[in-house]
């Protein structure tokens, strides 16, 4: 069994240390108040037994809490007082220097929590370590100076999660939709250099990758671009290539316009291939100031095209994008594997969902790609037009910002809908499970605590908003001055765009499944559980609507994709409430409104049920189904896609995509338990070295490739198939 030290390092549990610590406290009291050596040894044994039953690595603080409880149970109150006083004094010493140990442990790669915090960051790399070092300083400043104590306390107890405190010290926003069209058509400035409108498709792709990198370095959340904004440059290249071909072949006999066009189209396809390849490889190899590849989503929506020519050219780009993602990228052994980025989103619409539709061939290619590489994910134009309705009563279809955060419909001062160039200010998530358990099955008490926690979240969200208020455009010129989001003057504040619905700010929620079960012993898949779950969702929306009306700030409800935080919430719940069957008996809690990963339910029933909850998450949410290897059953994949089109706005299919670099095995790398810890192992050769295997799993909308903490790993291990 292992424990996690305060600096994040993971070490073997040693019961002798408990005996030594209690003995020191025991020796400092009068003889009549002392415990016997047998009592002290029994305490160490009981703590070890309780820790083993937790099925995860406990922190030093949790072990010490158990020791305190056991001493009190022995009624050795004087010993307990000395033990608690010693802990308190040590805590004061540690508090005087809050970051040194954390920073040193991550530099020396001893910090297990940091190693497993982000499934797309490699914590052994210098650039990532620099980002983590800055993050530790930011978290320290945020905790001691920038946030009210009540918010810090609630965050530390796992009552709420104040997202991205490692960036909160700076005036940075979360995620956005990049206005690539404006930047390419009207020019932009990158690092003080004027970039004019490109004169070819390949140049447009190159500029796009530079924009992606610059944007990623100026924010902490994801970004999305649309292939539609690149489509006009296909015809620019077409006309340019035609002129060149005509000049080359003009002296040859029998050269017709038809032959010129045929040669030109062949060269055009080669340029499209190079351009898309450039985006794929640049995105996975670029390193931003965040110490990672840009978290970027590429949107593929035929309905965005302005005319038939642009639509046909967009189809060419989409086709090439899907082909290249299906192929994958080579790992260091030269083997084709699944890349994490860019995330791809494909819109299902009338012109591509039916077998006799014009672009059905693209949908079949998308299904083939999903079965092998887990992308693209799917948006239903049909359902989104029903869910995203603006103040004029018009429905809209558009992409999320990065993983799943959706803007709310917005009409500008000219009466036109606007999505590209807008952003999200940040997220605070409520732990619904904690409210449910705190109520102790009393519904009146539940709603009282719910109201109190909502106001706590509101104050935390106001802190996020206030941190951005007064931010000048100079903080991130690529965003605020040169078109990625806006074109403000130098020194101009962004305040106007924090109000009026231009940007959103998100109230996140997690653990609806466990919350409902803790209250009424019913699952979301049962009628009573579903009804209560939907009631809670409607109540959450009532609060965001109330805040929005009062402050003219676009508060929106968001289905939080917990990554490392799922483990933190689970540990906090176990500490506060103990182990409760079907609620706190795992090292993770369920994301947003999702059906529990262990629930036996088929794909269609799951999507149909979750669609009701997704419609009540206007700030973003995504549903998924877990499937086996479907590469030889694409018709089944297509049937799920057709169901998505008719029933749910945004969904994805999860499969596995692994490779062992030791033996070449390309089946599923499995999760084993070893000495209380979950580890990854090749079932063919027994390789357990994570640096010598490629494992890709859906983590929270994105694909993760750098492994996960113990809570998320347990969740991945316990996922059941839905198809």
Locate the predicted segments by residue.
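Metallocofactor- and cofactor-centric catalytic cores in central/energy metabolism, strongly enriched
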Residues: 272-276, 280, 518, 712-718
């Amino acid at each position: 069994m292992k424990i996690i030290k305060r600096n994040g390092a993971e070490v073997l549990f040693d019961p002798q240390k408990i005996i030594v610590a209690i003995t020191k406290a025991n020796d400092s009291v009068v003889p009549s108040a002392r415990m016997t050596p047998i009592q002290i040894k029994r305490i160490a044994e009981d703590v070890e037994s309780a820790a083993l039953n937790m099925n995860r690595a406990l922190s030093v603080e949790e072990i010490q809490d158990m020791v305190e409880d056991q001493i009190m149970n022995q009624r050795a109150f004087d010993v307990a007082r000395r033990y608690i006083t010693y802990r308190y004094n040590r805590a004061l010493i540690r508090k005087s220097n809050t970051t040194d140990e954390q920073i040193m442990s991550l530099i020396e790669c001893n910090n297990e929590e940091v190693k497993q915090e982000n499934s797309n960051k490699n914590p052994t790399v210098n650039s990532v370590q620099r980002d983590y070092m800055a993050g530790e300083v930011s978290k320290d400043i945020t905790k001691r100076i920038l946030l009210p104590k009540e918010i810090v306390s609630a965050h530390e107890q796992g009552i709420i999660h104040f997202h991205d405190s490692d960036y909160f010290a700076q005036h940075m926003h979360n995620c956005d939709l990049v206005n690539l069209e404006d930047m390419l058509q009207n020019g932009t400035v990158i690092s003080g250099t004027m970039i004019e409108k490109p004169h070819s498709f390949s140049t447009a792709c190159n500029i796009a990758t530079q924009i992606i990198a610059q944007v990623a370095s100026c924010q902490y959340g994801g970004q999305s671009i649309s292939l539609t904004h690149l489509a006009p440059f296909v015809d620019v290249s077409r006309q340019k290539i035609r002129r060149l071909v005509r000049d080359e072949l003009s002296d040859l006999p029998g050269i017709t316009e038809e032959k010129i066009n045929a040669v030109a189209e062949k060269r055009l396809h080669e340029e499209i291939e190079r351009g898309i390849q450039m985006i794929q490889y640049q995105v996975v190899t670029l390193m931003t100031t965040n110490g990672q590849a840009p978290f970027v989503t590429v949107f593929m929506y035929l309905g965005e095209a302005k005319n038939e020519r642009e639509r046909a050219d967009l189809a060419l780009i989409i086709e090439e994008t899907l082909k290249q993602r299906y192929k994958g990228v080579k790992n260091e052994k030269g083997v084709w594997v699944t890349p994490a980025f860019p995330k791809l989103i494909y819109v299902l619409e009338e012109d591509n969902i039916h077998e006799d539709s014009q672009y059905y061939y693209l949908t079949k290619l998308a299904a083939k790609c999903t079965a092998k590489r887990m992308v693209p994910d799917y948006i239903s134009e049909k359902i989104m037009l029903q869910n995203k309705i603006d103040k004029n009563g018009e429905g809209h279809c558009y992409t999320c910002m990065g993983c799943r955060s959706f803007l709310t419909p917005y009409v500008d001062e000219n009466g036109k809908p606007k999505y590209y160039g807008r952003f999200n200010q940040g997220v605070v998530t409520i732990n619904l499970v904690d409210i449910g358990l705190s109520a102790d099955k009393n519904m009146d008490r539940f709603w009282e605590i719910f109201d109190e926690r909502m106001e706590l979240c509101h104050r935390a969200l106001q802190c996020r908003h206030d941190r951005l208020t007064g931010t000048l455009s100079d903080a991130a010129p690529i965003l605020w001055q040169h078109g990625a989001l806006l074109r403000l003057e130098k020194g101009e504040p962004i305040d106007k765009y924090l109000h009026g619905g231009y940007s959103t700010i998100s109230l996140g929620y997690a653990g609806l499944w466990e919350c409902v079960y803790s209250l009424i012993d019913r699952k979301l898949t049962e009628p009573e559980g579903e009804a209560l779950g939907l009631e809670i969702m409607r109540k959450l929306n009532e609060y965001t609507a109330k805040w929005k009306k009062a402050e003219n700030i676009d508060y929106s409800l968001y289905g939080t994709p917990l990554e490392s935080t799922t483990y933190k919430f689970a540990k906090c719940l176990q500490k506060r409430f103990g182990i409760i069957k079907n609620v706190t008996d795992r090292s993770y809690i369920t994301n947003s409104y999702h059906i529990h990963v262990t629930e036996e339910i088929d794909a269609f029933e799951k999507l149909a049920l979750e669609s009701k909850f997704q419609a009540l998450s206007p700030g973003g949410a995504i549903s998924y189904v877990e499937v086996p290897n479907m590469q030889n059953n694409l018709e089944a994949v297509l049937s799920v896609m057709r169901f998505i089109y008719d029933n749910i706005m945004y969904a994805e299919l999860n499969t596995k995509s692994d490779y062992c670099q030791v033996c070449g095995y390309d089946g599923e790398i499995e999760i084993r338990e070893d000495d209380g810890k979950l580890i990854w192992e090749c079932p063919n050769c027994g390789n357990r070295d994570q640096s010598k295997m490629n494992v890709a799993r859906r983590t929270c909308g994105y694909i993760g490739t750098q492994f996960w903490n113990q809570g998320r790993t347990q969740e991945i291990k316990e996922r059941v198939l839905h198809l």
